[in-house]
Amino acid sequence: MNIIVVGLSHKTASVDIREKVAFSPNSIEKPLHELVNLDGIVEGIIVSTCNRVEIYATTRDIAGGIARIRRFMAEYHHLAHDLLEPHLYSYHGEEAIRHVFRVASSLDSMVVGEPQILGQIKTSYGYAAEYKSSGIILNRFLHKAFSVAKRVRTETRIASSAVSVSFAAVELARKIFGNLTDKTVLLIGAGEMCELAARHFLTNGAKGVMVTNRTFERAQRLAEEFGGEAIPFDELFLHLHKADIVLTSTGAPHAIITPPDLEEVIKRRRMRPMFLIDIAVPRDIDPAVNEMDAVYLYDMDDLQQVVAANLEGRKQEADKAEAIIAEEIIQFYKWVATLEVTPTIVALRNRFEELRKAELERTLAGWKDAPPDAEKRLEALTSAFMNKLLHQPTTVLKKAGQGNRTDLYLDALRALFDLELGGTDTNESLELEE
C-alpha cells in the first residue's frame, strides 16, 4: 500500500484558484465518500484551508491513484482539467511522507512556524475518522505527523520568532497607517484567526475592536474578552463606517461585501481611507472594491509579501526541523515495513496459541490430583514459554520486512506451519508493532 498526496497551495495557485477548489467543512462528508469510492483509492483525507487544498490517500496503484484524484479535484468542483492541472502537485512514497510532515510542522506555511495549520489538519483528520474514510495506514500516518510537529515545536525555536497570518495582517495595517493608536478595527468572523487578530491589533495600540458574526453569541464572547463591541451580523452596514480597518474571515460561500455595499459607507466616512484585509477563502470581499476611492483591499496573496522578510531569520531553525523530519521518516518507514509481515506474525501466534491451549486442556483433564493453582501456574508457564519461543522468529520477520528477502521468509513460514492469513485486527497489528 502506498501513501500519495495531491494538492495545491499558496506556492502554486493564487487565491482565485484556491477558492474554486476549497471544500466546505459543512459538507465534507460527500467528497470524502466520493474520494474513497474512486477506483483504487483505499483511504482518504481532505485538508482544505485558506492557503492549501490537499488530499492524502492510500492506493496500490500510484500512477492511477494520483491521476484519479487530480481528475476528482477538478470534476467535483465542475472545473476544467486544464484550469487546475498547472497548479497541482503530487507526491508518493517518501516524498509524500516528507511533505505532510513539513506541512504539519508549519515548514510549508506562508508564515513558517505559524501554529494554525496543525489544528486545521487535526480537524480534517477528525472528519475523516468520523466519516470512516481513513484507516490503519492514514490513522497511523497522521498521528505520526502530529507527533513530528510537536517535536519540531519543542526542539527548535521555529515558533518563537514566527508570526501568524493574523499578525501579518496587523503588520500590513501598520505599513499603511504608520501606527494604529487612533484606529478602530472591525472583525467579521469570530474564529481563531479573528481572535488572534484582535490580540495583535490591541497589542499594537488599536483604539477599539468591534466584532460581528452570524452567531451573535460568539461575537459577544469575543468582544467581551477584548473589551470591544459586538454587532449583530444583519446590522453590519450600519456600523461599517466606524471602522478604519476591517478584517474578514468567515466561511461564507460568496462575497459578503461588494462595491454597492461600500458606496454609502465611504460617503459617511467623508473619504477617510478604509483598509480591508480579506483572509477568507473563498473571499469575503469582492475584489472590485479595490477600484473605489479611499478603499484599500488586501487578500491572502498580499500577506505573502508582508511575511517574506521574516523567512530568512528562521532558516537555521527550519534546517533543524528538516533534520528531525528526516529521522521521523525513517521511523515511520520501519512501521510501514511491518505491515506486510504483520498478518503472518498474527497467524503464527494464533497457531501456537491454539496448540498451547489444546495441550493445556489435555494436561489438566488427565491430572486428577492437580493442586488448586495448577491451571493458573500452567497458564503462566506455557504463555511465557510460547512468547520466548516466538520472540526470535518475530524479530527476524520484522527485520525482513525492512529488507529485500521478505517474500522468502514469509513463504517459508507459511508453508512450514500451514498458516492461513485471515483479516488482521487493526489494534492487534498496532500492538505487534509496538
Swiss-Prot record:
It is an enzyme of class 1 (oxidoreductase). The keyword NADP applies. Pfam families: GlutR_dimer, GlutR_N, Shikimate_DH. It comes from the Bacteria. The active site is at C50. Catalyzes the NADPH-dependent reduction of glutamyl-tRNA(Glu) to glutamate 1-semialdehyde (GSA). This is Glutamyl-tRNA reductase. It comes from Trichlorobacter lovleyi (strain ATCC BAA-1151 / DSM 17278 / SZ) (Geobacter lovleyi).
